[in-house]
C-alpha cells in the first residue's frame, strides 16, 4: 500500500513469496511477470510517477506467461494499478484494467485453465469483461506489508474473505 514505504523491506514479503510459503512442498508455484502496466513506457511513467525498474517487451512477457500457464493447473493473475495511480491528482480516462494487462488476462482465459484474478487497486474499477469471463475475482486493494501472506491465506482457504468484523 501507499504507506508501505515507511517499512523495512527485508521484513516483508511479496505476493509470490506469500504464495510459495503457503504452498510449501505441496504444490509447485510457477511465475511469469506477464506484462507491463501499460504498453507504452512513457504512459506508464506518467501514470505511476516512476520509471519502471523491470520493463520488458510485452510480446515476450506474454509468451512467457502463456508457457507458464500451459504447465499450470490454475492461473493466478495479479493485475490492476500501482499505488501512484489512485488518489488525489491520479485521474484516468478509463476505469478499466490498463490495456496491456487486459490483453494478458484475455490470453490467459483463452487457455481454458481456471483463472483467479487478484485485483490490486485503490479505487473501484469497471470489470464487465472480467466478471463474465474470469472464474473468480478477489479485490485485494493495496494491503501493505503483509499483503503477500494475507492473500495467500485466502487463496489456500486458511481464511474466508467475508468482510465480517469480529467482536
Where are these regions (language model features)?
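C-terminal non-catalytic regions of proteins with extracellular/luminal or membrane-system context
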Residues: 1-167
Amino acid at each position: 500500500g501507499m504507506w508501505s514505504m515507511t517499512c523495512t523491506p527485508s521484513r516483508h514479503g511479496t505476493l509470490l513469496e506469500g504464495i510459495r510459503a503457503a504452498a510449501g512442498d505441496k504444490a509447485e508455484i510457477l511465475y511469469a511477470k506477464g506484462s507491463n502496466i501499460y504498453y507504452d513506457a512513457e504512459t506508464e511513467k506518467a501514470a505511476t510517477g516512476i520509471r519502471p525498474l523491470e520493463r520488458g517487451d510485452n510480446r515476450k512477457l506474454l509468451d512467457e506467461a502463456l508457457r507458464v500457464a500451459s504447465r499450470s493447473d490454475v492461473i493466478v493473475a495479479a493485475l490492476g494499478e500501482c499505488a501512484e495511480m489512485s488518489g488525489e491528482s491520479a485521474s484516468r480516462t478509463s476505469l478499466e484494467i490498463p490495456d496491456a494487462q487486459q490483453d494478458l488476462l484475455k490470453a490467459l482465459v483463452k487457455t481454458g485453465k481456471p483463472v483467479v484474478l487478484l485485483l490490486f487497486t485503490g479505487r473501484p474499477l469497471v470489470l464487465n469483461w472480467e466478471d463474465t469471463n474470469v472464474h473468480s475475482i478477489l479485490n485485494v486493494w493495496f494491503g501493505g506489508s503483509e499483503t503477500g501472506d494475507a492473500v495467500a491465506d485466502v487463496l489456500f482457504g486458511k481464511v474466508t474473505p467475508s468482510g465480517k468484523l469480529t467482536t
